Amino acid sequence: MNQEVMNLFNQQAQPQSFDQIKISISSPEKILSWSYGEIKKPETINYRTFKPERDGLFCARIFGPIKDYECLCGKYKRMKYKGVICEKCGVEVTLARVRRDRMGHIELAAPVAHIWFLKSLPSRIGLLLDMALKDLERILYFESYVVIEPGLTPLKERQLLSEEEYLRAQEEYGEDSFTAMIGAEAIRRILMELDLEGIATSLKEEIATTTSELKPKKLMKRLKIIEAFQLSGNKPEWMILTVVPVIPPDLRPLVPLDGGRFATSDLNDLYRRVINRNNRLKRLIELRAPDIIIRNEKRMLQEAVDALFDNGRRGRVITGANKRPLKSLADMLKGKQGRFRQNLLGKRVDYSGRSVIVVGPELKLHQCGLPKKMALELFKPFIYARLDAKGFSATVKQAKKLVEKEKPEVWDILDEVIREHPVMLNRAPTLHRLGIQAFEPKLIEGKAIQLHPLVCAAFNADFDGDQMAVHVPLSLEAQLEARVLMMSTNNILHPANGQPIIVPSQDIVLGLYYLSIVADGSVGEHKADDKNNPMQGVFGDIGQLEHALAAKSVSLHSKIKWRWRGLGPDGEPVSRIYDTTPGRVILSGVLPMHPKVPFDVVNKLMTKKEISAMIDTVYRHCGQKESVIFCDRIMALGFSHAFKAGISFGKDDMVVPENKWSIVEDTRTLVKDYEQQYNDGLITQGEKYNKVVDAWAKCSDKLAAEMMGRISAVQKDENGADKQVNSIYMMSHSGARGSPAQMKQLAAMRGLMAKPSGEIIETPIISNFKEGLDVLEYFNSTHGARKGLADTALKTANSGYLTRRLVDVAQDAVIREVDCGTTNGIKMRAIIDAGQVVAPLSIRILGRATAEDLVAQDGTVIVKTNETIEERHLPAINAAGIQEVKIRSVLVCQTKSGVCATCYGRDLARGTPVNMGEAVGVIAAQSIGEPGTQLTMRTFHIGGAAQIADSSFVESSFEGTIKIRNRSLAKNSDGDLIATGRSVAVVIVGPDGTERAVHRLQYGARVRVDEGDTIKRGQRIAEWDPYTRPIVAEVDGIVGYEDLYDGQSITETTDESTGIAKRVVIDWRGSSRTSDLKPAMLVLDQDGKPVKLARGSDARYYLPVDAIIGLDPGAKVRAGDVLARVSTDSAKTRDITGGLPRVAELFEARRPKDAAIIAEKSGSIAFGRDYKNKRRLTLTPHDGSDAVEYLIPKGKHIHLQDGDVVELGDYIVDGNPAPHDILAIKGVEELAAYLVNEIQEVYRLQGVSINDKHIEVIVRQMLQKVEITDGGDSDILTGDQIDRTELADFNEKLLAEGKKPIQGVPVLLGITKASLQTKSFISAASFQETTRVLTEAAVNGKVDTLDGLKENVIVGSLIPAGTGSLAADIRSIARRRDNLILQQRSAENAANAAELSELPPAAAE
């Protein structure tokens, strides 16, 4: 009995399970069915009694009682009257909680248009009626009448009439001869009378017959919305409201403040306005007030309802008493503070605490130190339960008292409770999944949380006052997940690139580096030629060595011989003698015993890179447990030796090179020389600037190299033994702290500085910090520092926003199946930039599955199809000299709604094949977004020291023989080979005949090699001036000018500072007289006729604006000589500042500012008639299809001449190509390769490594949609965009029925657009543009099937990824089985019925 009573009291609403959510426009009947009563008065509560007014906005009769089980007048109290309705005050006796979900309504005296369907672009009402929004507003806000039924009058249907026109028409045709109405009633009437089917049929006919370009698009839009209404079951007139719902009062509370005032939700003000105006309107109608007054009141009612739904969308924003705009219903959903992002996606949690972190070097990797006070508070319920179970307390109250008094037994119990109960630590900002990790708590005194030093890198934490939050996983499942998936020991590798993230840094690195140094001539070293003491410095076991170290008869750095005992390749014990040092032997003592981890792993100088590689080796071969133990051990070793070494530095450790001033003087002379050249008019101002900056950059580099040489050199003492290495060099070289760039500023020269605008200041800072800066230099250096700080603040926000968009677009990319079975793949090759291999093939294909057998030249199969390429395969692949590998990629994965494990490859954070249900999309987004923030925070570390962008030569990175493709080279007057073609490529062929590298040469480059030459590594292939683009003659002859008229298309400018004249092409399009000039330089023969080129056209070279002409008419010219040159922009510093916006631009698939123009087909070029201020260029394809025309702005430099032949995909105008063009011209694979390379380029510049597959996942999500080019036999319209998977499903059906399939081309969407076009409207609405998304979803009656992660978080169910994917799978299997059982049953029933009907009648009885 007792139990039942308790159950009655604690009746929780049972959570309902549902599979999908539908949204549609609500009908007036629906609104009334939700409502518990009409609200007739604007009053809220009585200010004296604090009781709600009857029929007011808080009415208890409508919305329910204020206190649990108590009516308003107090006649019925307590549980026993549950469900009774009080006859005096009309309140139902029930829980007060119903005030959170009971709604009311307001009956409007005049219909009102719903502002979302009217004003949210495109206006749905406008599209449906085919009327302009302006006209609709004039009708709705009572400015114009609309003709509804013209009758026999000459008026047209839906014609707008002003007041005068309406009255005139009534006089002219009689009052009853036509019907015209005004206001929302008119619109409602028109909407009700719409014949949707008829309109749809006529629209389809019109689309089929229309000839114009733009019309079908407009008609399609209208047809789409009409079909949406037909399919969704919404009625058009529902977009006009006759009833307004009122949300429950507890969701718009009114709270009394002290001092008799009230704080209220803005919604109450907005509702009050609506009720007041509605009641006034009712009264005016009853009083039969003049039309004009009623009309004004109706307009005000419309405005009040508009403000309630979406304040500020139309007209003035309605403000409250304090001039602050009121928050309407739409504002409640929108933005960061709206319902979606504030409450549904991010919730506050209990059982959490936060405190400052301090370092805990004696912790194990899986532990964290938790202050006792904090633990006591966090684990309270567990402690109460344990106290109760152990009999220390009989009631919770007693247990509470014991805990409050902090009795000794409580601490013992706390120890028990905490044992093996992991807690989660989180540091904001959580940029990737390693920002939350689980640890086992260890109780400590004090109030700060202790953190293990090795996990700092993952959290990006330091101990300068950072705070961290602790969360307690409560349920057993949560504890299990925390331990198995989130424990810090399970997160050794970085999900972005698969390298270890548990890597020692700073002190530890310094200690290990110190430990592994070798010093010549140290005490007790082994000398092979020492006859007196041949066994000095020879050691056989560790005990002997430790003894010698303790006795100081040998130092840590002495060269010794050492017998190492370990395991051979077959796992048998072996021993070998090594030349090494005692320090390295100590280090080898912590290595795990394993055949693949020999002594060579530690027998080298341990820099940070080497340590990382060592941890990686141990992890790959010995597994996770060994690695964790090993990491803890090397940490302890590193700390202890760093402290014993006692490394510190003073000012004398900063060694300034002796020849500093001579180098500086040389550069100064060079700069003077450039100034002189400029004064003599040999070079332009821009060129001088570039050269000066270049000279100083070189000087600065040279000095830095000198200084590094001095600092890294090892000095000898008087006994000929090595002195200790320079401390600063040790810190920098080991990777503990500081970089060569910072050392350069300390001891060489600070170098060039950048202005805030990004330009480099010509005068560098010659002093270094040791010498000190003078005032001017100090001032120059402040620019960079300020810019750094300002940038940081701005970019943190930008980077966070980029991450948010990436997560949103990729959140539903989850591993759904093991293998999708596709045979497609993408081709991978090494990335070579300016002859340097920046990403070798082996790194790019590691951990990916092959799409075809990988075969060596002798026919042996190295890796079979669909097998993952592991570390063990790489030596064979490299040995076989394979240049290109076809691998599986998510870009070609055929899995519906997700990706498959084979296409994805290895899970980088585990080093194993990826698990089912892994949320690879979110991991990809975090991997790309996290370094964005990191980098932006790093801009100011080198304090604006300028790094110059362009390289001006290309060197070979291989040995081999030279072949030249598309050869068009000429020897110029100086005897140099000059590339006179656009597509000249130098190919380096290896000894085995494979192409090792292909370098496309810059037009006008000086080529240093020729066909058949042999080339060595590091040899120059070609060089060019990075600051100018030349226009080069292709034949010998005499210079001629064409259309170059002084003052019209060419001008002689005299430089003020030098007095030298030079000829520059000016913008000739300014006046109509000169607009059709085509300034050009010609190469003429002896008769003064243009020389014919090999391809048949004249040697005529069109000049762009600002070209500087180098030769006079009549001058002799050799092929390869420069006729004119165009200065390019001066060198800007490259910094991720350019980087982050660039990444965003690529992911958003925006057209770059001056996009390249790419040839759509292979063919020949001809110049046509100019059009206004554009050049017309015609491309005649080789395949005989229609010619393509390009209009190019006149100032743009077109480097093609008449008659040039271009290949498909060649650039006609240089620039950054637009991704859409690449997709259209070269296809998906090329586009993906371009995006991956461009994005990687930005990150590589900053030294961040991200695996390609992450970028591929995002690109896959950007390519989800297909644009229909031919609807086939379906009812899908041409030009529609549909999902790839939908297209496949449609075509499957059509082909099965023997019909014509749909044709489509892939479309590239930017990440924002792609996020807003996901199938799930809940996900899209919680991302951006909430109003627009919800309006569209409601009109279409969309159903959200809750497939993605975000929707499930919002509705509060388990996400279908990770451990939640299992639950989802089980549910789907259960559903399938239920269906099978139902089918069987129905089949059995049918069979039984059939049997019964077959029985003879007598037997049936």
UniProtKB/Swiss-Prot annotation:
Query: Which residues does Zn(2+) 1 bind?
Result: C71, C73, C86, C89
Catalyses which reaction(s): RNA(n) + a ribonucleoside 5'-triphosphate = RNA(n+1) + diphosphate
Residues binding Zn(2+) 2, per UniProt:
C820, C893, C900, C903
Gene Ontology terms, cellular component aspect? Answer: DNA-directed RNA polymerase complex
Arranged from A to Z, the UniProt key words for this protein are:
DNA-directed RNA polymerase, Magnesium, Metal-binding, Nucleotidyltransferase, Transcription, Transferase, Zinc
Q: How is the cofactor bound?
A: Binds 1 Mg(2+) ion per subunit.
Q: Which GO terms describe its biological process?
A: DNA-templated transcription
* EC numbers for this chain: 2.7.7.6
List the SUPFAM superfamilies hit by this protein, alphabetically.
beta and beta-prime subunits of DNA dependent RNA-polymerase
Annotated binding of Mg(2+), by residue: D462, D464, D466
PANTHER family in the record: DNA-DIRECTED RNA POLYMERASE, DNA-DIRECTED RNA POLYMERASE SUBUNIT BETA
Name this protein carries in UniProt: DNA-directed RNA polymerase subunit beta'
Q: Which organism is it from?
A: Methylorubrum extorquens (strain PA1) (Methylobacterium extorquens)
